[in-house]
Amino acid sequence: MRDPSSLYSGFPAGSQYESVEPPSLALLSSIDQEQLPVATGQSYNHSVQHWPQPWPPLSLYREGGTWSPDRGSMYGLSPGTHEGSCTHTHEGPKDSMAGDQTRSRKSKKKNYHRYNKPPYSYLAMIALVIQNSPEKRLKLSQILKEVSTLFPFFNGDYMGWKDSIRHNLSSSDCFKKILKDPGKPQAKGNFWTVDVSRIPLDAMKLQNTALTRGGSDYFVQDLAPYILHNYKYEHNAGAYGHQMPPSHARSLSLAEDSQQTNTGGKLNTSFMIDSLLHDLQEVDLPDASRNLENQRISPAVAMNNMWSSAPLLYTHSKPTRNARSPGLSTIHSTYSSSSSSISTISPVGFQKEQEKSGRQTQRVGHPIKRSREDDDCSTTSSDPDTGNYSPIEPPKKMPLLSLDLPTSYTKSVAPNVVAPPSVLPFFHFPRFTYYNYGPSPYMTPPYWGFPHPTNSGGDSPRGPQSPLDLDNMLRAMPPNKSVFDVLTSHPGDLVHPSFLSQCLGSSGSPYPSRQGLM
């Protein structure tokens, strides 16, 4: 083992640290301080000349340092380094590395202005650029270029949208690939077309995003007219710029609203009223849109006539003469409205037009909906909105057919009842001598009648006019099976009370008892 005294042979000759007795550990740990503690009882001079320490302090040894007595220094440190220099040597590179990482992290975060993402689906944007192309077909590179040109959001460093474009082209069945070379199906540079009939209507609508929820009015609500009718779509700068003057933004929103109003009538894929009327006009209603335009009245007049009846559709059985072209006779259908009954009043706007022109339009036809039978007297009543207008010939009422279903206001018996009113009452026991007292032709509890004596002596009940023939009655009018089953399975529920008192009252009667009927 090495002599500990040899460890201190590194002090220069004449040094105050040179001593026969080895210094204590406290002296070794604080050798670089200005005032050394009195370890050996000697007084040290305060003007200490600092010499380079040949080994690091012992505190590093306690912290896990690898100190070698042979080398007299720590591994990785020069022999002439002291505690302060050792600390700076280790912490200096760490601080420089942390600073470099912070600067690199700041350099990666680019401070650029990012445009708002368009609130449309990728399917709608792809179909839009393909339909706006002259040949209605584009390559993948052309689609990417047109989309980035039309929507500035895709001009930034974000490249994930290109994968979304490729995914929608390959997964959606509305896009079809046209091979540039049929012999090389796996080659690149093929064309893509779109089948507009397979595009979902919801995919062309404005999507629910944070931009649209914030009240942005710069984007059109529906791309269907631009995709289906090949309208030219031009991106709006106000949709992406954040520093737009309020006056310019207001003018752009007004222009877009007017554009939507003008294109709404030509759109036949939306459920707008103008679109539906346009479809009806193309079929067989040339005057439908004109009549509805005349019905658009002011709000004040609409409040006074808010309970006026809605127009009904009539199908004309005779050719009528068109008011615009007197020499041309066409067969068409028009709209008309009614006041109290089905068709005795026209709308206010249409009435004013007739009063100005002095013409009366003849409407002869049968309404699709059957009128009420008990509204005969209501046709003579006048409404304040009718004026002096009265049709030349009111529409004829449809006769009640036997195949029509009964309604709450039908004044005839439906054909599927058990017994029609033209025959005698249906009775379950034809051999019983039972006479009906009431005038009702039915044998159900709501129609049970009771005798009302007219004199003190009383009259005998009147008998049936003809014998009951159940077979012929059911052969002439087949009963409703469900009702017939109920009547035959529970006959006691529908037996007249007077029958029970007449025929089943006595105990010696040959007829079955009441318990047999129940």
UniProtKB/Swiss-Prot annotation:
Show the ranges annotated as biased composition (Basic residues). Answer: 104-113
Keyword annotations = Activator, Developmental protein, DNA-binding, Gastrulation, Nucleus, Transcription, Transcription regulation
Q: Where is this motif: Fast/FoxH1 motif 2 (FM2)?
A: 415-421
Motif SMAD interaction motif (SIM), residue range(s) on this chain: 470-491
Top-rank lineage group of the source organism: Eukaryota
Q: Kindly state the tissue distribution recorded for this protein.
A: Highly expressed in the animal cap (prospective ectoderm) and prospective mesoderm of stage 10.25 embryos.
Q: Where is this region: SMAD-interaction domain (SID)?
A: 380-506
Q: Which GO terms describe its molecular function?
A: DNA-binding transcription activator activity, RNA polymerase II-specific; RNA polymerase II-specific DNA-binding transcription factor binding; sequence-specific DNA binding; SMAD binding; transcription cis-regulatory region binding
The keyword Nucleus belongs to this UniProt entry's keyword annotation = yes
> Which positions does the motif Fast/FoxH1 motif 1 (FM1) occupy?
405-409
Q: Give compartment(s).
A: Nucleus
| Stored Pfam families | Forkhead (PF00250)
Which coarse location class applies to the principal site listed for this UniProt protein? nucleus
Does the record bear Transcription in its keywords? yes
Q: Where is this region: Disordered?
A: 72-113, 318-397
Q: Where is the composition biased (Low complexity)?
A: 329-346
State any GO BP term from the record: activin receptor signaling pathway
Q: List the disulfide bonds.
A: none
Gene3D superfamilies in alphabetical order? Winged helix-like DNA-binding domain superfamily/Winged helix DNA-binding domain
Q: Name one GO cellular component term.
A: nucleus
Which residues fall under the DNA-binding region feature?
117-213
Please quote what the entry notes about the protein's domains. The FM region is required for binding smad2/smad4 complexes. FM2 is more effective than FM1 and only interacts with phosphorylated smad2 that is in an activated smad complex.
Query: What is its quaternary makeup?
Result: ARF1 contains 2 smad2s, 1 smad4 and 1 foxh1/fast-1 protein. Interaction with smad4 is most likely indirect through interaction with the MH2 domain of smad2. Binds to the MH2 domain of smad3, which can incorporate into the ARF1 complex. The ARF1 and ARF2 complexes are activated by distinct TGF-beta family members; formation of ARF1 is promoted by activin. Interacts (via Fork-head domain) with gtf2ird1/wbscr11 (via repeats 4-5).
Question: What is the protein's known function?
Answer: Transcriptional activator. Recognizes and binds to the DNA sequence 5'-TGT[GT][GT]ATT-3'. Upon TGF-beta induction, forms a transcriptionally active complex with smad2 and smad4 called activin-responsive factor 1 (ARF1), which binds a site on the mix-B/mix.2 promoter called the activin response element (ARE). Binds to activated smads and the ARE with much lower affinity than fast3. Necessary for the first steps in mesoderm specification, directly inducing mesodermal genes. Acts with fast3 to control the convergent extension movements of gastrulation.
Query: Under which name does UniProt file this protein?
Result: Forkhead box protein H1
